[in-house]
């Protein structure tokens, strides 16, 4: 049996690896496995021609997972595959080690790893951290849940003549489910709020996967976490080699906040690191993201100048409280990435009043949308709901706000526009997944921009 705690002793030429899932991460893991000389077998539930084309000449099966998967020494599981599928259970019964693509790729790099997880804000934070590393002269490889699959970056690293490389990873709870020896030098946890409860039994099960990162840090590394998050503050308060960031207190923080100004050292230091008002990001949740990235970068040894310059020059990531434009003094913001309650609350809190809020899509699992009410009061003038979750949202919020139901996403935005007046803000922050009408949140956000463009042109 393969000893996953002694990777260096494995003879890869004699090792059979089954890869479950032929999406981006699965194909990348297969390419990396082929490079190291392992025997690769890919099993994919779909049988689409595109999937088959991506697999290429490797040994594979499509249209379901047969017992051929069990003819393996290691199973690499793609993150989108739930743990309760029968073939996973059978692998467990036969004691076949199951690892994530993240765990697998980590075996083949000696470069430092900066890894971040959390419920909301991950992509903005890791992109900013990535820019800080580049600004400091590092070869930064952005991957995981954003950018390239980790395996693809590791393979490129192995086959290219690059120096001073660092892996910056965004990690979802799914990607953390089967880690073993994965040990980043710097690990960050932004926040934990209810999400993916269609996959996890409850918030505790979901939080456990996120918190797993805190126990997988290199012995010389650091854990960076948000002291304002109640789950993190309680769970990680006794963690050694940890540094916190906070909007509410400066104790134990390297970067300290005074109003919108951030200092390294004491708050009366005249040489501030940056003023949040000088950045291109909106909303105090983004100030939190900046503090997280800056703290991780500082812990890694990135220069103060590189941190400052990256913050000031950073451009917001699409679909994350993205200002799309203005029509007749009505602003349009695309926050399609806000697929849960906490993300929507953070977006709504970024505005003072006159909000027309678009909610809806596919509910992730018995969501209590009334949690939005305290934040929406005095800010939201009306709500437009759409999609599979639209009627349930209407049932929960109808007594509190003027509310209109639209079955279709485009109708929802057109209705919001028709109901708007000069000085209003139309905010798409749906608090739901996109899978009822779109392939992903990016497609939904792009549709928002497309409709806005038509409205702007008067079409």
Which role fits each region the language model picked out?
Residues 1-100, 104, 282:
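N-terminal leader/targeting and accessory segments in enzymes
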Residues 2-17, 27-36, 139, 274-380:
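Nucleotide phosphate-binding/pyrophosphate-handling subdomain across enzymes
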Residues 34-35, 67-70, 79-227, 231-241, ...:
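Phosphate-binding loop of NTP-binding sites
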Residues 44, 61-63, 99-103, 240-257, ...:
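Beta-strand->loop->alpha-helix junctions that form or flank phosphate-binding loops
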Residues 52, 59, 370-424, 459:
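C-terminal helical cap/extension that packs against the catalytic core
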């Amino acid at each position: 049996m393969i000893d996953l705690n002694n990777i260096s002793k494995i003879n890869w030429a004699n090792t059979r690896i089954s890869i479950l899932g032929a999406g981006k991460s699965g194909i990348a893991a297969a390419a990396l496995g082929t490079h190291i000389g392992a025997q690769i077998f890919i099993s994919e539930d779909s049988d689409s021609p595109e999937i088959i084309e991506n697999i290429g000449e490797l040994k594979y099966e499509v249209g379901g997972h047969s017992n051929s998967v069990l003819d393996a020494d290691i199973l690499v599981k793609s993150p989108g595959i739930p743990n309760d599928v029968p073939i996973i259970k059978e692998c467990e019964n036969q004691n076949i080690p199951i690892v994530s693509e993240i765990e697998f790729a980590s075996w083949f790099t000696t470069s430092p790893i900066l890894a971040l997880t959390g419920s909301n804000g991950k992509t903005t934070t890791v992109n900013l951290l990535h820019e800080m590393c580049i600004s400091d002269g590092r070869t930064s490889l952005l991957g995981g849940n954003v950018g390239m699959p980790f395996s693809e970056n590791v393979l490129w690293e192995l086959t290219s003549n690059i120096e001073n490389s660092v892996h910056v990873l965004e990690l979802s709870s799914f990607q953390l489910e089967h880690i073993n020896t994965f040990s980043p030098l710097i690990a960050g946890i932004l926040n934990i709020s209810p999400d993916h409860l269609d996959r996890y039994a409850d918030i505790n099960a979901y939080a456990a996967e996120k918190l797993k990162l805190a126990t997988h840090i290199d012995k010389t590394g650091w854990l960076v976490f948000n002291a304002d998050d109640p789950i993190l503050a309680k769970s990680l308060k006794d963690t050694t080699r940890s540094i916190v960031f906070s909007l509410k207190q400066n104790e134990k923080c390297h970067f300290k906040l005074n109003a919108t100004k951030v200092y390294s050292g004491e708050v009366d230091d005249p040489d501030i690191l940056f003023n949040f008002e000088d950045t291109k990001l909106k909303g105090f949740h983004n100030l939190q993201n900046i503090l997280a990235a800056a703290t991780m970068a500082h812990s890694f040894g990135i220069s103060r100048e590189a941190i400052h310059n990256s913050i000031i020059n950073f451009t917001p990531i699409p679909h994350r409280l993205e200002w799309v434009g203005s029509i007749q003094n009505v602003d349009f913001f695309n926050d399609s990435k806000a697929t849960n309650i906490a993300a929507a609350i953070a977006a709504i809190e970024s505005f003072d009043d006159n909000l027309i809020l678009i909610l809806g899509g596919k509910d992730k699992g018995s969501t209590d949308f009334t949690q939005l009410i305290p934040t929406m009061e005095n800010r939201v003038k009306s709500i437009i709901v759409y999609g599979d979750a639209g009627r349930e949202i209407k049932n929960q919020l109808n007594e509190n706000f003027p509310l209109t139901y639209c079955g279709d996403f485009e109708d929802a935005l057109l209705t919001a526009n028709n109901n708007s007046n000069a000085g209003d803000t139309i905010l798409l922050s749906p608090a739901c997944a996109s899978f009822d009408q779109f392939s992903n949140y990016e497609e939904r956000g792009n549709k928002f921009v497309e409709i806005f463009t038509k409205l702007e042109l008067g079409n």
